[in-house]
Amino acid sequence: SYDLFPNKTVLGNITLAPTLVQKRDKAEVEKEAIALLERVGLADRKDAWPHELSGGQRQRVAICRALILHPEVLLFDEVTAALDPEMVREVLDVMLELADSGQTMLIVTHEMQFARAIADQVIMLEDGGIVEQSDDAEAFFTNPKTGRAKRFLHTFECDRHRRPAETP
């Protein structure tokens, strides 16, 4: 359900917290919510109910609901875990756009190709402890320091999947 309120439309889910908690003007919040929905490709679903949406659409609504609060950092915990492959791409595309726009995100993921494409810093955790930490994400993926990280990354063949170089 992505913790969407089943008795509220997409627009109602996004506008609830800013109007109720932050006491922001409803008309301004709705305008911003629609702009966020346009940003994630869901403006045409603003009047839909959560049960009418796919998993990927619900996840994108949840992202809009977080963004409308103007957070300094967005937290994502296995954001694609329950999604089918088509929906995974939709959500990852939104997250990539957020990163490109400068949004700071803390992402827990097993999507190693995506992590490599988007990360500035990487912390690999296992059993609640830090296996390896790198302030240089590319160095982590190309030359991990620990044997455990090397074995893990080899499983995903991360060295074969790189983000295309940007052209000047």
Positions of PLM-derived features:
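Conserved ABC ATPase signature
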Residues: 49-53, 57
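Catalytic Walker B motif of ABC-type/P-loop ATPase nucleotide-binding domains
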Residues: 74-77
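H-loop/switch region of ABC-family ATPase nucleotide-binding domains
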Residues: 109-110
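A short, surface-exposed alpha-helical micro-motif characterized by mixed small hydrophobic
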Residues: 115-117
